[in-house]
């Protein structure tokens, strides 16, 4: 049995890919997306091998009760936790009853564990090295249909069914706050183009009109990436897609941006994180405030929609900084491009994070909290933490509101707290950019409401 608790509103690639490996080896595999379907106790109790996918922090916290239940109902089962957040939380996972902890490129190790289990052998230790795998086409049979997952809302109000895949894994960069870094250590691995294209074709046949590439950075290998885009667009000319690309890479590979636009790229997500150069240096992001402005201009000139994401609240933020962030988003005409949840994101500090290397952060940190799987931090200015709570509450009560309306309310609130004059409101109007109805976020503390809802 393979279990996912949350995968950003996508049909879980982290179940479909290992399912292909296990089924090829002759195993009967049940895939359960617990964000969509009930986890049946009878299935848990009868499984020989239980794998729980942990691709992000929210999924990991939600997995705790699932793992405990599996161990209680099925003491002899071999329980594996796999994915980016498994190695980061290994002691906690083992305390819950997990037998095996796998990080990146987990498919071959899962298959090896299954092979040893079927032969009655003790599981052999897995390597700490990141292997180079020849992947299989993900097997999505048994998963909920794509129509039950996030959709892409177009500017004209129509919606597209969304599929997802990965053209590469890991990342060659070392951003301090990123969960990829402790696992991949600056390495990335490409997925063979024929595998990616076959996965896309299968999802198009299943109704997908849009594909989200889940790569941490699509331009880690730009030649590989564009080969896939060119082939995909040739085979499916009406298929749109979105990708995630660093600001640094948007500048380095600016010549490729028009090709993305011409190939039906709906938008490019980029983790801007902050507009403060000092904070960007702390995070080791590889770009500056000015670089962000250049990327905005380059994307506009190429006809690409840039969707910036932020870690809006962090220990170095001032009220004035937050007002500047909001004002800049408005001045650059990016209000419709930013999911309101991005304005409430708070820095997450998990175990093994490179953030723990920063002397400038240590003074703000408390002891590791097993309940939240992170190091809690308190801002030196209590007004900042109070603002974060209020912005989070505001966003949570405006889930169906126009983005401009929400941003106007947040700007007014922030300027009031900072003792600044009220801003000129951003003119109203419907969103003129496509967006997913399950906002993308990472490297962040989950909204408590998200945890309760899921």
Provide a role label for each language-model segment:
Residues 1-205:
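Acidic, low-complexity intrinsically disordered segments
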Residues 1-3, 23-24, 31, 43-52, ...:
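Radical SAM enzyme core and accessory elements
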Residues 6-7, 56, 217, 247, ...:
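Residue-level signal for short, function-critical loop segments
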Residues 22, 66-70, 74, 228, ...:
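Hydrophobic positions in alpha-helices of CheY-like receiver
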Residues 28-30, 77-79, 211, 241, ...:
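Hydrophobic anchor at the start of a short beta-strand
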Residues 48, 99, 209-211, 266, ...:
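Short acidic/polar active-site loop segments enriched in Thr and Asp
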Residues 144-305:
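Radical SAM [4Fe-4S] cluster-binding motif and immediate context
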Residues 222, 233-412:
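A structural motif corresponding to the C-terminal lobe/cap of the Radical SAM core domain
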